[in-house]
Design a protein with these regions (language model features):
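Outer-membrane beta-barrel channels and translocator barrels
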Residues: 20-28, 70-73, 101-105, 149, ...
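Residues on the lipid-exposed face of transmembrane beta-strands in outer-membrane beta-barrel proteins
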Residues: 13-19, 62-68, 96-100, 154-158, ...
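Membrane-embedded beta-barrel scaffold of Gram-negative outer-membrane proteins
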Residues: 1, 109, 143-201, 207, ...
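Gram-negative outer-membrane beta-barrel transporters
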Residues: 69-74, 174-177, 195, 199-292
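Transmembrane beta-barrel strands of outer-membrane/channel proteins
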Residues: 33-39, 77-81, 96, 110-114, ...
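C-terminal beta-signal and adjacent terminal beta-strands/loops
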Residues: 179, 282-291, 316-371
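Residues that define the transmembrane beta-barrel architecture of outer-membrane proteins
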Residues: 7-11, 54-60, 90-92, 148-152, ...
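Face-selective signature of the C-terminal outer-membrane beta-barrel domain
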Residues: 1-88, 167-175, 210-212, 218, ...
Length: 371
């Protein structure tokens, strides 16, 4: 009954022109002009739930930019004009970029970019969930406006060699200001088919800011290590209610946005055809909504635990012939078995109450043919 059919037709056509100036005003530059047309026709039908959805999206765009650059400096100015058929006005998204290389091993960059998300249905809106035994569908609020963003970033990309060890360090600070930000809330009234309704609407503004650090080191030809961590804060300008059944539960913090997350990758190649890799992903605690059902008697927002997922993979390449290689691999996914342990169960579960790594500890083997 819950199954349906989705037809999605997408096509893109565009053109681009690039002209290089030996000198334009004060420095050599590259001028880029372009135009693009996007069409996406989406039709989703679930007969068992009497759900019929059709959406045609047409976007005509024109973009331009000029980048002045030499070995030490680059300065970019540009913008993009978009006309979306679900909006009655043209959107202008500016961008600017400043790069400075005081030495060959230091790259400093300051960036600004504007952007938007149109008031349209997205892939995740087509999903029909289950909350407390009732179907949950996502709808767009009346008079939904586009979400606008202004993003700034400042980064330093550093390279250095310590003896025989080659290293790279990237430090980036970022800040994004969002207006008419999209948010979701569960309404207390069902739709005409009796479905529980989750509405996408314009909340107040929001801000996302943080720091990203990534490092890479090549100790030898057979051992490399890469790691990164992101520290961020994601907050609405004013607290909003996530569920109309509990209007007193208001939060400024954005749901499903951890303040800390990171990764590491270690690769060993002791012999030519053998590779061993150890990878890990860290996800900090985040706030998520838990609707009433088999797990809780009334809706409540909870802070999830932290997760550290570690994976291992071993691979060996067998040359079959001059142009063909057979790889045999195997390993363990999620060695630490970092996995959610409080899933809802039964007919009245909250099907969206899922977080953390997608799989518990798992073992795998594989074969790969390359030529």
């Amino acid at each position: 009954k819950a199954y349906g059919t989705t037809h999605d037709l997408t096509y893109v056509a565009g053109t681009q022109y690039v002209h290089s100036f030996g000198k334009l005003l004060f420095m050599p530059s590259d001028l880029t002009l372009g135009a693009e047309y996007n069409f996406d026709g989406l039709k989703d039908v679930i007969l068992g739930y009497d759900r019929h959805f059709k959406q045609d999206v047409r976007i005509g765009s024109f973009f331009f930019q000029n980048e002045w650059k030499n070995k030490q400096w680059s300065f970019l100015l540009g913008g993009r004009l978009d006309k979306h058929n679900l909006m009655d006005h043209v959107i202008f998204s500016p961008r600017a970029n400043l790069r400075f290389n005081p030495t060959e091993n230091v790259n400093l960059r300051l960036t600004y970019a504007g952007g938007f998300r149109a008031p349209q249905a997205f892939d995740e809106d087509l999903h029909v969930g289950v909350v407390g035994g009732e179907r949950l569908v996502t709808v767009l609020a009346d008079n939904l406006k586009e979400e606008r963003s202004n993003s700034f970033s400042l980064s330093a990309d550093l390279y250095h060699k310590f003896g025989s060890v080659q290293t790279n360090l990237l430090i980036e600070g970022f800040y994004t200001d969002l207006n008419n930000v999209f948010a979701l809330r569960q309404l207390d009234q069902p739709d005409a088919q009796g479905n529980t309704v989750q509405e996408r609407y314009n909340a107040y503004g929001a801000k996302v800011l943080g720091l990203n650090i990534e490092a890479k080191a090549m100790f030898t030809r057979w051992f490399t290590l890469q790691a990164g961590i992101t520290l961020q804060q994601s907050h609405y300008d004013e607290a909003i209610a996530w569920n109309d059944e509990v209007p007193e539960q208001k939060y400024k913090k954005m749901m499903r946005t951890p303040n800390t997350y990171g990764y590491f990758t270690a690769t060993f190649t002791p012999v030519k055809r053998f590779t061993a890799s150890l990878t890990g992903n860290y996800t900090g605690s985040m706030l998520i909504g838990h609707s009433a059902g088999s797990g809780v008697e009334e809706p409540v927002a909870v802070n999830t635990p932290k997760f550290m997922e570690v994976n291992m993979k071993l691979a060996y390449d067998f040359p079959v012939c001059k142009y063909l290689t057979l790889q045999v691999n195997g390993g363990i996914q999620n060695i630490t078995n970092a996995y959610q342990n409080d899933f809802d169960k039964g007919w009245n579960r909250d099907s969206s109450y899922i977080y953390g790594p997608s799989l518990p500890r798992s073992y795998f083997v594989g074969v790969k043919v390359s030529y």
